[in-house]
């Protein structure tokens, strides 16, 4: 709940006699506001309505930011534009960003003001109380002294004599820490200013005293860094009465854009000084005094004639600039609103439909969630899941594993046949264990032992592949659960538990089948026709190879080499058939147990959850952050929907 207090009027300000000059000045201001209303009011109404909707939470809206070096007179410029006395003095005066929202009332309506910061909202009944309330707010936010804060203070002013406008007063740039300020005060202030002036929707008013070298001004340098072309930067020279005699022509050159070029150029104003305030010079009188100053000044008179001097001319210029800037920003603003709307809609869609209040509908809702989950699992099993361009389907990953397995088998048997160790073993058998068989005959027992040993060596790699594939499938199923049940902590947790239990059982069953298959592979067997064909092809290839190598020359191979060659041919023939069998059968076992049966068991397990209707509410308990996120997205969509309607109405 916001704290609401009322700043009472303490005493009545001293009234000055109503002179004809003051009346003319006030009439000038009223005419200015009238022009402003005719030209800008429709645009400002649109932006204000968007701001009232809270669209600034989603994107930036057109505004005017006033920046300047410390004590450059920027607060005085805001004061002159708004008709409200703001904190002023030496050192850092603006210690928090001040959002000044001006609202024009009809003639005769009463002035009112409001200061809003954090959870505090203070009604102000008279302009003379504004400065005190701003100082109080700054002390509460940034603390007593000269520290700064990035927390906003909002000052709303409603008056017949102000235009509809939003201005932002930012802390003045300082270079040396004083008092209780942190050593990095300059960096903090610059970072705070940059957050505002870098937005393309912000017009930057760079305030520079007339009696300093503009080329060395830090404020102008910062503005040029974020706006190199000067498309949204206006230079404002202040304190022309403090210019040293003889340097007036240099000031004129600056205002005429001849020194430090800005696309939007410069203007010059003379606001109330400290002595004027002490003498209680009113803002209307200050405008008249400013007019007389420029009109009678021998060098600056020409700037008044060019429309580049005085606060009324500045206000008129800002009217045109802001109107143009808003119109220029509207297409971009409309596009940003549409993009943000689409993003929010897509994000909200991921959270799914709202949970029904009725119990029977809630059960139907849960059933639908589980059915969608089961369909997604089935799509994974059937290699029909929807994926992005950068992703790969689950079965594609498994197929790559199976292809790598087949390559591994071929490489394994190839190394076996070509290994010097195996040739040494066969030669040792020929030398030490050969029986009655004639040269060239293969000892079947030796042949069988070699086959068993090499096939056995493939068992652990097969199990390793099983574990890799199981992990892939488990992760894919878990991702489906997360996509479908991610907002429902209990349902997602239950699904993950089911996935883990079924994974364990199916992996265990697949491991038993793989080990059983390798036990069967220890029985050396092959269909006669297949084995004969493979052996014949191997012998023909080797004969062709020998023929091309030695030509017609027939050589007599030693007895040992003959037996070894024969054994190698038989091993090669058997490996071809055995390798095909293992290369096909192990992937089939894994697909059946880890993909197909796993998916079927998951479907059964999830449907069984519907049997216990008492747990329906428990399963559909949403995570608190999900609920808040959905509420946030719905509020954003409502804002953006209304913003789209207002923009469409404005365009029409």
Curated annotation (Swiss-Prot):
<dbReference type="InterPro" id="IPR027417">
    <property type="entry name" value="P-loop_NTPase"/>
</dbReference>
<dbReference type="GO" id="GO:0005886">
    <property type="term" value="C:plasma membrane"/>
</dbReference>
<dbReference type="InterPro" id="IPR000375">
    <property type="entry name" value="Dynamin_stalk"/>
</dbReference>
<dbReference type="GO" id="GO:0045071">
    <property type="term" value="P:negative regulation of viral genome replication"/>
</dbReference>
<keyword id="KW-0051">Antiviral defense</keyword>
<comment type="similarity">
    <text>Belongs to the TRAFAC class dynamin-like GTPase superfamily. Dynamin/Fzo/YdjA family.</text>
</comment>
<dbReference type="GO" id="GO:0098793">
    <property type="term" value="C:presynapse"/>
</dbReference>
<dbReference type="GO" id="GO:0045087">
    <property type="term" value="P:innate immune response"/>
</dbReference>
<keyword id="KW-0391">Immunity</keyword>
<dbReference type="GO" id="GO:0005634">
    <property type="term" value="C:nucleus"/>
</dbReference>
<comment type="function">
    <text>Interferon-induced dynamin-like GTPase which has antiviral activity against influenza A virus, (IAV) and Thogoto virus (THOV). Inhibits IAV by interfering with the process of primary transcription, probably by affecting the viral polymerase function.</text>
</comment>
<dbReference type="GO" id="GO:0070106">
    <property type="term" value="P:interleukin-27-mediated signaling pathway"/>
</dbReference>
<feature type="region of interest" description="Bundle signaling element (BSE)">
    <location>
        <begin position="332"/>
        <end position="357"/>
    </location>
</feature>
<feature type="region of interest" description="Stalk">
    <location>
        <begin position="358"/>
        <end position="622"/>
    </location>
</feature>
<dbReference type="InterPro" id="IPR022812">
    <property type="entry name" value="Dynamin"/>
</dbReference>
<feature type="region of interest" description="G5 motif">
    <location>
        <begin position="270"/>
        <end position="273"/>
    </location>
</feature>
<protein>
    <recommendedName>
        <fullName>Interferon-induced GTP-binding protein Mx1</fullName>
    </recommendedName>
</protein>
<dbReference type="InterPro" id="IPR020850">
    <property type="entry name" value="GED_dom"/>
</dbReference>
<comment type="subunit">
    <text>Homooligomer. Oligomerizes into multimeric filamentous or ring-like structures by virtue of its stalk domain. Oligomerization is critical for GTPase activity, protein stability, and recognition of viral target structures. Interacts with TRPC1, TRPC3, TRPC4, TRPC5, TRPC6 and TRPC7. Interacts with HSPA5. Interacts with TUBB/TUBB5. Interacts with DDX39A and DDX39B.</text>
</comment>
<dbReference type="Pfam" id="PF02212">
    <property type="entry name" value="GED"/>
</dbReference>
<keyword id="KW-0547">Nucleotide-binding</keyword>
<feature type="domain" description="Dynamin-type G">
    <location>
        <begin position="58"/>
        <end position="331"/>
    </location>
</feature>
<dbReference type="InterPro" id="IPR030381">
    <property type="entry name" value="G_DYNAMIN_dom"/>
</dbReference>
<dbReference type="GO" id="GO:0005874">
    <property type="term" value="C:microtubule"/>
</dbReference>
<feature type="domain" description="GED">
    <location>
        <begin position="564"/>
        <end position="652"/>
    </location>
</feature>
<dbReference type="InterPro" id="IPR001401">
    <property type="entry name" value="Dynamin_GTPase"/>
</dbReference>
<keyword id="KW-0399">Innate immunity</keyword>
<dbReference type="GO" id="GO:0048471">
    <property type="term" value="C:perinuclear region of cytoplasm"/>
</dbReference>
<feature type="region of interest" description="Middle domain">
    <location>
        <begin position="357"/>
        <end position="526"/>
    </location>
</feature>
<feature type="region of interest" description="G2 motif">
    <location>
        <begin position="93"/>
        <end position="95"/>
    </location>
</feature>
<dbReference type="GO" id="GO:0031623">
    <property type="term" value="P:receptor internalization"/>
</dbReference>
<dbReference type="InterPro" id="IPR003130">
    <property type="entry name" value="GED"/>
</dbReference>
<dbReference type="InterPro" id="IPR019762">
    <property type="entry name" value="Dynamin_GTPase_CS"/>
</dbReference>
<dbReference type="GO" id="GO:0005789">
    <property type="term" value="C:endoplasmic reticulum membrane"/>
</dbReference>
<feature type="region of interest" description="Disordered">
    <location>
        <begin position="1"/>
        <end position="27"/>
    </location>
</feature>
<dbReference type="GO" id="GO:0005525">
    <property type="term" value="F:GTP binding"/>
</dbReference>
<keyword id="KW-0963">Cytoplasm</keyword>
<dbReference type="GO" id="GO:0051607">
    <property type="term" value="P:defense response to virus"/>
</dbReference>
<keyword id="KW-0539">Nucleus</keyword>
<dbReference type="InterPro" id="IPR045063">
    <property type="entry name" value="Dynamin_N"/>
</dbReference>
<dbReference type="GO" id="GO:0008017">
    <property type="term" value="F:microtubule binding"/>
</dbReference>
<dbReference type="GO" id="GO:0003924">
    <property type="term" value="F:GTPase activity"/>
</dbReference>
